[in-house]
Amino acid sequence: QTCALPISIIVMSDSHGERDIVVDIKKRYQGKVDAIFHNGDSELESSDSVWEGIHVVRGNCDYDSGYPERLVVKLGDVIIAQTHGHLFGINFTWDKLDLWAQQEDADICLYGHLHVAAAWRNGKTVYINPGSISQPRGPIHEKLYAKVIINDAKIRVEYYTRDHELYSELTQEFER
């Protein structure tokens, strides 16, 4: 996909049957950002019309084999690798996910599964978990999704609540 900088994307994950919040986020951002991603465990059918215009992968709770296990999306010169994470054993190690991201030469690797919002860098790649939009785990009991803004110099990760309020404590910036 041809995109000029800055590039902005929306990332959500682990909605676990809550179709309405996926629709809400899609309506709010479609046409205003360069891409929308869902990192799996929607528990919706892969043929659901909500997925039109959304990059979506299969999670461990998605029994519909119509979803891909992983995607690689190129927006301008930015390579985004996307997966749920369970097949890479992320509960135990980052090694397999990291190896795949390196093989794809990914600038950003999106994952879900853990229901914990996180953004961190290893080597070239910035790893982003948007948290769960429905069932958060870990110390932050907030249902979240992420907005990522990429420009020449930086990758900025912002987290938002279901009410689309910025959860500023989690904002991070990474050098490109």
Spans of model-derived segments:
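Core catalytic region of metal-dependent phosphoesterases/phosphodiesterases
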Residues: 7-76
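Charged phosphate-binding loop/patch that engages nucleotide di/tri-phosphates or the phosphate backbone
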Residues: 151-176
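Helix-adjacent hinge/juxtasegments
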Residues: 57-60, 66-107
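A short, polar/proline- and glycine-enriched secondary-structure boundary/capping micro-motif
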Residues: 21-23, 91-95, 139, 165-173
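Conserved beta-sheet core of the metallophosphoesterase superfamily
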Residues: 55, 91-154
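Active-site-proximal beta-strand elements of phosphoester/diester hydrolases
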Residues: 8-16, 79-86, 126-131
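Active-site environment of divalent metal-dependent phosphoester hydrolases
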Residues: 16-21, 42-47, 61-66, 88-93, ...
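Short, small-residue-biased leader/transition segments that mark boundaries at the very start
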Residues: 1-5
